[in-house]
Curated annotation (Swiss-Prot):
Changing residue 328 to G: Seems to promote [2Fe-2S] cluster binding in the C-terminus. One of its GO terms (molecular function) is 4 iron, 4 sulfur cluster binding. PANTHER family: CYTOSOLIC FE-S CLUSTER ASSEMBLY FACTOR NUBP2, NUCLEOTIDE-BINDING PROTEIN NBP35 YEAST -RELATED. Homodimer and homotetramer. Predominantly homodimeric. Keywords: 4Fe-4S, ATP-binding, Cytoplasm, Iron, Iron-sulfur, Metal-binding, Nucleotide-binding. This is Cytosolic Fe-S cluster assembly factor NBP35. The lineage of its organism: Eukaryota, Viridiplantae, Streptophyta, Embryophyta, Tracheophyta. GO terms for biological process: iron-sulfur cluster assembly. Binds 3 [4Fe-4S] clusters per homodimer. Contains two stable clusters in the N-termini and one labile, bridging cluster between subunits of the homodimer. Although plant and algal NBP35 proteins lack the characteristic CXXC motif in the C-terminus, thought to be required for Fe-S cluster binding, they can bind a [4Fe-4S] cluster in the C-terminus. Also, in this linage, no CFD1 partner protein homolog as found in other eukaryotes can be found.
Length: 350
């Protein structure tokens, strides 16, 4: 039971656990919570006061959500943080995906540890203006499973919010776990009083993913978190033709033969201009209209599509920004366009 919440099994005329008469009034007689309410400390939760003080130095707070796992939410969170840092903003990235912390890998910070100073826990820094906090920095090894129930997860989220010293930062990006679970309720409860800019929801095009995204949108509306928009990730596979592998199927044996060199040689000889085109294919069924149609139906902004790009996957594996080295020629422009809709007043640097 959180401070101030009336328990579901309370008596009909419950005065509320924060009332001076909590556990003492006539209406409390026979209530299963009578003793707990009578002895509970009254007044504001001191942790919420501490969180408000910490968050007072954070200008903007953005939640990154998804209905399902595996849709690229953490990849988007990482690249959003890289992009904001590339705009010369001071950025913090908080990973509250307690059971699946992939942010340390995607920021190139595996093996790093949290340090403590007289100001609190210090984030692990990728760059001078990009700090990261994750439970991944607290595990003895990256294969260690986190088997925690809700209260312990909520306790760590609260500790991240009240004990991590970010300093004066422009953006705090919060990478949440998929779905709508204890972690989501906690982060909203703790952050909403301090001001949340809103949530970006990441999905893939197929209906099986969008079903859960609708629930995510509904959650945001119920708890009062603005939906900044929905990103359709993995919107078709796109890559330069010269990077495509060509296979000849041997139907009799079920095996296949790599004929890539033969195909590229043939194109180079007979149609070299085709080597510069981009090959695209639909990976997920978007016949239902995808995220764009869902956004129209639910009245939330559609931020855009990000194609499935092997180079973006490689950047995530290597913990690098997709906006550097001009390698993510397919995905980087799409991500840049989406991020500029969220942060319209700032132009991204190349």
């Amino acid at each position: 039971m959180e401070n101030g919440d009336i328990p579901e099994d309370a008596n009909e005329h419950c005065p509320g656990p924060q009332s001076e008469s909590a556990g003492k009034s006539d209406s409390c007689a026979g209530c299963p919570n009578q003793e707990a309410c009578a002895t509970a400390p009254k007044g504001p939760d001191p942790d919420l006061v501490a969180i408000a003080e910490r968050m007072s130095t954070v200008k903007h707070k953005i939640l990154v959500l998804s209905g399902k796992g595996g849709v690229g939410k953490s990849t988007f969170s990482a690249q959003l943080s890289f992009a904001l840092a590339g705009m010369d903003h001071q950025v913090g990235l908080m990973d509250i995906d307690i059971c699946g912390p992939s942010i340390p890998k995607m920021l190139g910070l595996e093996g790093q540890e949290i340090h403590q100073s007289n100001l609190g826990w210090s984030p692990v820094y990728v760059e001078d203006n990009l700090g990261v906090m994750s439970i991944g920095f607290m595990l003895p090894n990256s294969d260690e499973a986190v088997i925690w129930r809700g209260p312990r997860k909520n306790g760590l989220i609260k500790q991240f919010l009240k004990d991590v010293y970010w300093g004066e930062i422009d953006y705090l990006v919060v990478d949440a776990p998929p779905g709508t679970s204890d972690e989501h309720i906690s982060i909203v409860q703790y952050l909403l009083p301090t001001g949340i800019d809103g949530a970006i929801i990441v999905t893939t095009p197929q209906e099986v993913s969008l079903i859960d995204v609708r629930k995510e949108v509904s959650f945001c509306k119920k708890v009062g978190v603005p939906v900044l928009g929905v990103v359709e990730n993995m919107s078709g596979l796109s890559q330069p033709l010269k990077d495509v592998k060509f296979m000849k199927l041997a139907t009799e044996t079920g095996s296949s033969i790599n004929v890539t060199e033969d195909v590229i040689a043939c194109l180079r000889k007979n149609a070299p201009e085709l080597l510069d085109i981009v090959a695209c294919s639909e990976v997920f069924d978007s016949s239902g209209g995808g995220a764009e149609r869902m956004c129209r139906e639910m009245g939330v902004p559609f931020l855009g599509k990000v194609p499935m790009d092997p180079q973006l996957c490689k950047a995530a594996e290597q913990g690098k920004s997709c906006f550097e080295d001009n390698k993510c020629l397919i995905s980087a422009p799409a991500l840049k366009s989406i991020i500029q809709k969220v942060v319209p007043s700032t132009v991204m640097t190349e």
